[in-house]
Structures are given as structure tokens and as C-alpha cells.
């Protein structure tokens, strides 16, 4: 009789282990879902709208001394339209890819790519002057999107890649 109970316990233990091995991955924490499913795609979409529909304002906010004013050169307009298209595509891809899966590996792969893009985005404003990175009292609306918001996104991505906020896998409670 004891052997039967032992085998039943062992089989039950094996069944539980099999279920745990095939369980879906832990969901992505709420903060990351809020930032990467909503906040970033909406802000990127906003950038697309301004780059396409408000080109003179976009250029003026980027660097007023070199902005051409209301008469935007055709080449500049084409480049801004292309930028708007890239922002639109990025916004839709991020929102749709991350909504399609809870697989943290997929999320992390995208976060690595976007983190590299964050560094490129920050580097792209260097011609404005090094103080653009820290002189917050001089920032305008587009600077807030280009600098502190990108800092925030990069830090949030780093936290996600480091596993901050995720439940630890394989942690077992000590039985007494």
C-alpha cells in the first residue's frame, strides 16, 4: 500500500513538473505594457503627424536658427515625409508586434533594437550642441521628446532587459 502511495505521489509530482515546463511564459509587467504598447507608439505617431503635417513647425522646433521658415525646400519636405512614414511604421510595428505575443524573448529582441535606435536618436541631435542633453531650461516641446523622453524610454528598456519587475522563475518556497 505504501508503494502505491509513493508511486502516486511521484506521478503527481511528475505531472506538476510537466505542467510547469509547458506553462506559458510569465506575462510582461504592467509598466512595460503601458509604456511600450501605448505611450511610445502614441508619442511616435505624434512625431509622424508633426513631421508630415506641420513641417515648418517641426523644423523650427528642431533648430530655429537653421529652419527655412514657411517656405520649405522640396528636398526637405520629402525627407520629412519619409521621416513621418518611418515614425508611422515604427509606431505600428511596435504596437502590433508586442500585442501579438507575451513571449519575453520577442519583447527583448525588439527592446535591444529600439535601445540602439535610442542611442542613435540621442546622437542625432548633437549638432544642436552638447548642452542639448542637459540644459533642460532651454528645451522646447520637440526637445522634451528628443531628450528626456528618449532617456526615459532607454532606461525603461534597460530595466526590462535586466528583468526588473519580472517574477523570478524557479523560486520555490521552503517547506517546513
Give a label for each model feature.
Residues 2-31, 166-176:
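Transit-peptide-like, low-complexity N-terminal presequences
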Residues 50, 57, 90-100, 124-131:
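Membrane-helix exit/interface motif
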Residues 41-72:
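Hydrophobic transmembrane helix segments
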Residues 75-98, 113-119:
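Core segments of alpha-helical transmembrane spans in multipass integral membrane proteins
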Residues 28-47, 80-83, 103-176:
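Eukaryotic polytopic
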Residues 19, 62, 66, 93, ...:
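Membrane-targeting and insertion segments and their boundary/processing signals
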Amino acid at each position: 500500500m505504501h508503494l502505491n502511495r509513493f508511486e502516486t505521489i511521484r506521478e503527481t509530482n511528475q505531472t506538476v513538473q510537466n505542467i510547469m515546463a509547458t506553462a506559458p511564459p510569465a506575462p510582461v509587467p504592467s509598466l512595460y505594457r503601458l509604456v511600450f504598447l501605448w505611450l511610445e507608439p502614441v508619442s511616435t505617431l505624434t512625431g509622424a503627424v508633426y513631421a508630415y503635417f506641420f513641417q515648418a513647425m517641426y523644423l523650427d522646433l528642431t533648430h530655429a536658427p537653421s529652419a527655412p521658415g514657411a517656405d520649405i525646400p522640396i528636398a526637405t519636405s520629402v525627407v520629412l515625409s519619409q521621416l513621418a512614414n518611418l515614425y508611422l511604421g515604427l509606431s505600428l510595428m511596435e504596437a502590433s508586434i508586442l500585442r501579438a505575443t507575451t513571449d519575453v524573448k520577442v519583447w527583448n529582441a525588439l527592446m535591444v533594437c529600439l535601445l540602439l535606435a535610442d542611442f542613435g536618436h540621442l546622437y542625432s541631435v548633437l549638432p544642436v550642441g552638447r548642452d542639448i542633453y542637459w540644459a533642460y531650461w532651454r528645451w522646447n516641446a520637440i526637445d522634451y521628446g528628443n531628450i528626456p523622453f528618449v532617456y526615459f524610454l532607454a532606461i525603461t528598456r534597460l530595466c526590462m532587459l535586466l528583468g526588473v519587475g519580472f517574477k523570478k522563475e524557479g523560486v520555490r518556497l521552503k517547506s517546513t
